[in-house]
Amino acid sequence: MVLAGPAVVLADAPTVLGDMSLWEYCVAKGYADVTLTKPQIGPNAAFNNWRCVTAEGDLRPFSMVQVCKWEYNLTAVQAHPIDKNDAYTWLCYSVGH
C-alpha cells in the first residue's frame, strides 16, 4: 500500500502593481496633507514614518497595505519598500492570484 503525502501547491509570486499616492489617500480620507516624521533617507526610514495630517496639524498613522487596497481597489495586496532606508520606495503588490 502506497500513501501519498500532502500535495504541494506553489503560490504565484507577488506581482508589482505600482507605487502609492499617499497625499491623495490622506485627502480622500478627510485629512489635509501627508508628511514624514523623520528624514526620507536613514536607517529604516521606510518604516513607521508616513502620517496623514489633520487640518489642525495632528498626525495620524496609516497602513501602507490600506493605501494599496484603496489605490488599486483590491483586497489581496501587500506593501513593501524597495529600500528599507528610503521612505519614498514603497510599492504595492497583488497576491493570491
Task: Name each model feature, range by range.
Residues 9-97:
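Mitochondrial intermembrane space
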